[in-house]
Regions:
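A short, charged helix-loop
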Residues: 97-127
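C-terminal flanking tails of non-heme Fe-dependent oxygenases
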Residues: 1-84, 89, 130, 136-330
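Core domains of carbohydrate- and sulfate-ester-processing enzymes
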Residues: 79-105
C-alpha cells in the first residue's frame, strides 16, 4: 500500500510532516493525502456533475468536442487520446485556464485560450472553477513543504506559478470493456504535481515500483492520490521520483470515474534546480532519460509535446502536425 500522509500533521509538527512528505516522494513518488482541507461537499459535487455529464447522449457531449478547440480543450470521445501510440479506453473533458487566445501565437503559446464548457448539467462550470481554485492552493501548499524539506527557501517554486499557471483538470470516465486492458497506458506525468480524485469503488490504477513490480492503488476514503511529475524530478536531480503508472480498463458492465488535477507552472516557466544538501544529494538517483520522450527546460515545450502526441487528430486538424504514432499521455 502507498504511504498515507495527513496534512493536518504539518500544523503541529511541520518538520516531521516534511520529512515524511520528502521520503514518500523519494521512495515511491506516489502517496495518499488525507487531512487536505477540501470539503466533502465540494468533492461530492464534482463527482456528481461528472456522472451527469457522461450519462448524457453522445450528441450532447460532442457539442464541446475537442476537435473544435485548437487549445485541446473540451470533450474527447472514447479512443480520442493515445498513450505510447495506443488507444486509451476512456472519454474525458479537458479544462484549463480560461484566457484570451494570443493572436499569431507560435509553439506552446497556442495552448492558451478558452475552455469549451458544457451547457448541461447546470453548475458544471462554477463547480470546476471552484475546484481549480481549491486544488491549486492545496498543490502550492505541498510544494512549499517540499521546498523546505529539500533545504531550499519555502517560496523557491512560487515564481513559476505566480502568473498564468497552466493548470489542467481532466474529468475522466473509463467504460467497461472486454476488448482491451488499456484504460490509459503506462506513463509519467510531464508537469510538476498531480492530485487525483477517484470515485469510491473505482479500481484500476496501478503504480510501478522501483523493482518493476506493478501494484494496485485503490481509492482511499477521504484521500487524494498524489504523484510527482517529471519537472519536479528534474528540479531535484532525481531525488524526488516521477513514477510510471497506468489504468487498467474496467471489466464489462462496470466503469471508473476519476478527476486528475495537474498543477503546472506558466507555459514559459522554468522550474528552478534545487541545490540539495549533501546527505540528500548522495541519495539522488539522477533523472531518468528517455530518448523517445525528452524533458525540456520550459514547461510549455513539454506540454506542447504531450498534447500533440496524445491528441494527433486535433494537432493535425488545427496545427497541421502529421500523426507520428509515438504518443504519450498527459
Amino acid at each position: 500500500m502507498l504511504p498515507v500522509l495527513d496534512l493536518t500533521d504539518a500544523d503541529d509538527d511541520a518538520a516531521g510532516f516534511r520529512t515524511r512528505l520528502r521520503e514518500a516522494a523519494h521512495d515511491v513518488g506516489f502517496f495518499y493525502l488525507v487531512g487536505h482541507g477540501v470539503a466533502q461537499a465540494q468533492i461530492d459535487e464534482v463527482l456528481a456533475l461528472s456522472r451527469k455529464f457522461f450519462n448524457q447522449p453522445a450528441d450532447v457531449k460532442n457539442e464541446i468536442s475537442q476537435l473544435k478547440s485548437p487549445q485541446f480543450r473540451g470533450y474527447s470521445r472514447i479512443g480520442g487520446e493515445l498513450t505510447n501510440g495506443e488507444v486509451d479506453w476512456r472519454e474525458q473533458i479537458d479544462i484549463g485556464p480560461d484566457r484570451q487566445v494570443i493572436d499569431g501565437a507560435e509553439g506552446y503559446w497556442r495552448l492558451q485560450g478558452p475552455n469549451l464548457w458544457p451547457s448541461s448539467p447546470d453548475g458544471f462550470r462554477a463547480a470546476f472553477d471552484a475546484w481549480d481554485h481549491a486544488l491549486s492552493a492545496l498543490g502550492l501548499r505541498l510544494l512549499r513543504h517540499w521546498a523546505v524539506s529539500l533545504g531550499a527557501q519555502e517560496d523557491v517554486f512560487d515564481a513559476a506559478f505566480a502568473e498564468l499557471p497552466a493548470t489542467l483538470i481532466k474529468v475522466v470516465r473509463y467504460p467497461g470493456t472486454a476488448d482491451t486492458t488499456q484504460g490509459v497506458g503506462a506513463h509519467k506525468d510531464s508537469g510538476v504535481l498531480t492530485l487525483l480524485l477517484v470515485e469510491p469503488g473505482s479500481e484500476g490504477l496501478q503504480v510501478e515500483l522501483a523493482s518493476g513490480q506493478w501494484i494496485d492503488v485503490p481509492p482511499l476514503r477521504d484521500a487524494f492520490i498524489v504523484n510527482i511529475g517529471e519537472l519536479l524530478e528534474v528540479a531535484t536531480g532525481g531525488y524526488l521520483r516521477a513514477t510510471r503508472h497506468r489504468v487498467l480498463a474496467p471489466p464489462p458492465n462496470t466503469d471508473r470515474v476519476s478527476i486528475p488535477y495537474f498543477l503546472n507552472p506558466a507555459l514559459d516557466a522554468t522550474i528552478p534546480i534545487i541545490a540539495l544538501p549533501a546527505e540528500l544529494a548522495a541519495r539522488s538517483r539522477g533523472v531518468e532519460a528517455d530518448p523517445n520522450n525528452p524533458i525540456y527546460s520550459s514547461y510549455g515545450e513539454n506540454a506542447w509535446k504531450s498534447r500533440t502526441r496524445a491528441h494527433p487528430d486535433v494537432a493535425e486538424l488545427h496545427h497541421g502536425i502529421s500523426p507520428r504514432g509515438n504518443a504519450s499521455a498527459y
